[in-house]
Amino acid sequence: MASHYEMFPAVVTRVEQLTPLIKRFTFKRQDGQNFPRFSGGSHIIVKMNEQLSNAYSLMSCTQDLSTYQVCVRKDVEGKGGSVFMHDQCNEGCEIQISEPKNLFPLAETGNKHILIAGGIGITPFLPQMDELAARGAEYELHYAYRSPEHAALLDELTQKHAGHVFSYVDSEGSMLNLDELISSQPKGTHVYVCGPKPMIDAVIDCCNKHRYRDEYIHWEQFASTVPEDGEAFTVVLAKSNQEIEVQSNQTILQAIETLNIDVECLCREGVCGTCETAILEGEAEHFDQYLSDAEKASQKSMMICVSRAKGKKLVLDL
């Protein structure tokens, strides 16, 4: 069932340049009220205008709800949202902020928690580390980045979590040895990873190699994982009695929008769940991060902003 988000008019109260490519944005509600409560790992949808909206991990303190904070890495080859945030979203800018949702929560139990971050993937771990510290849990952050000038938030983290933070700098030849890290953990350790897809894949593969159960491996990635060389296919819209060809370089959502059919989709990254659509016939190749593995295997619904057809035809409840 499609997810729906309550939206709050907000204003940007502070913009900080943390690295050459990363800015931190602080938001307040326009009505002066507190934002909803959230837990570490939660994301929000930032709606910049009618065309642009992106999902970002909340990185602010879970106890201070007067503001929300996110970090945005500028990606000139992306959909345009990060460029808008960097180039046009200044202090005083009015935008829409969604209520938080958490698809990347901390496990409630576990002997130890290993957090692995690459680049901008550090953001969800800030509130999570605070939560783990408050629990008195055993935890470590392993943070890899390209060069010292790209080490967003490292000083803040090492000050708050001394002895729990380990950093790896590509430009200095300091590499994270995943096999050594994963294999040396006690039984019952949870592993979390957020960062570029190659890092996520490597962590998952390493955990599988050392026989970690699926429920002990947690990952989050907002960048799209849709292959660029997909095949064209046909989509039949059962309710509107229309048929459309989805080209290899199109998403189903983009194709449907050419018919002027309105489908709600906030993130366009397979994260928020707002475009979830029932599958009446055919099978989907799932690329979203919203549905569970079991839900994907059931082939009952799909996220039309990123997922595609396995075969030549899909019939959707639209």
Swiss-Prot record:
**What region holds the 2Fe-2S ferredoxin-type domain?**
233-318
Q: Read off the PANTHER family from this record.
A: PROTEIN YIIM
Question: Which organism does this record belong to?
Answer: Acinetobacter baumannii (strain ATCC 19606 / DSM 30007 / JCM 6841 / CCUG 19606 / CIP 70.34 / NBRC 109757 / NCIMB 12457 / NCTC 12156 / 81)
- Could you identify this protein by its name? Carnitine monooxygenase reductase subunit
Query: What domain of life is recorded for the organism?
Result: Bacteria
Q: What does the UniProt keyword field contain?
A: 2Fe-2S, Flavoprotein, FMN, Iron, Iron-sulfur, Metal-binding, NAD, NADP, Oxidoreductase
Q: Bound how, and how many: what does the cofactor note say?
A: Binds 1 2Fe-2S cluster.
Residues engaged in binding [2Fe-2S] cluster? 267, 272, 275, 305
Q: Please state every residue range assigned to the domain named FAD-binding FR-type.
A: 5-107
Gene3D superfamilies the record matches: 3.10.20.30, Nucleotide-binding domain of ferredoxin-NADP reductase (FNR) module, Translation factors
Q: Which GO terms describe its biological process?
A: carnitine metabolic process
